[in-house]
Amino acid sequence: HFNYMLPFFKDSRYMSENNKPLMVIYIPNLIRKLDKMLALWTKMAKENGFDGLTYIYQSAASSFDSSWNKGLFDYGVEMNPGYVGMYFNKKSRGAFPKLMKYSREIKRLLGIKRSLNLLEKNLGVGKCDYDEMWQKVLQLRPKVDCGVKMIPCAVTDWDNTPRHKERGWAYINATPEKFKQYFAQLVDNTKKYYETDMIFVFAWNEWAEGGYLEPDEKNGYALLDAIKAV
């Protein structure tokens, strides 16, 4: 992975902090010997003229899983919409992150490729209000955990029914105009409360989950224009 990323790290356009290129890892607590892997990558980065790497993790479940060492990372991403849902639902912040972690391991060991939840299928597509989600996102205040600084995350939309059909869920009332309004407020919050000038956006091209900034036939470049305007 490091050797693949190295040409990008050396590109002058690649984001870096104090001569440490950014390296984002999704659900790092699933990686065996994570500490040794990051130590090796840091060593390799220094051998290639950098002062190390800036490590960032992203995963709602990872954020609330206390069983792994977040101190290996410089930043964590408030990976919305999952993060805000777990933040305001204390019941899901206990066993759920660990279940997410170990259920993947169990499925891998047993060779299970799909999991079926008949109850969810019978309930049909879930619907959530876009405005309500954003109001909660704007209430978030970063908490430094193990020295890890948090990065806020904006959400364009969510609809994972293309992937999960009846078992999926989607936001209602999402528009580019609302996204622009809420994104502007998130920028203000970032300046006031967060120890970073970065904001992550869900997402660039998660078409199967309804979160994307890429232009489409319905809204054209409206979401990209919203960010540009802010």
Question: Where does each model-flagged region fall?
Answer:
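Alpha-helical scaffold elements lining the catalytic groove of polysaccharide deacetylases
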Residues: 1-7, 37, 130, 167-182
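The substrate-binding groove and active-site-proximal loops of carbohydrate-active enzymes
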Residues: 21-32, 119-132, 167-177, 209-216
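Aromatic-lined glycan-binding groove of carbohydrate-active enzymes
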Residues: 40-173
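Substrate-binding cleft of secreted/luminal carbohydrate-active enzymes
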Residues: 174-215
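Active-site groove signature of glycoside hydrolases
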Residues: 2-31, 197-206
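Extracellular zinc-dependent metalloprotease catalytic-domain scaffold
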Residues: 2-8, 12, 28-47, 53-56, ...
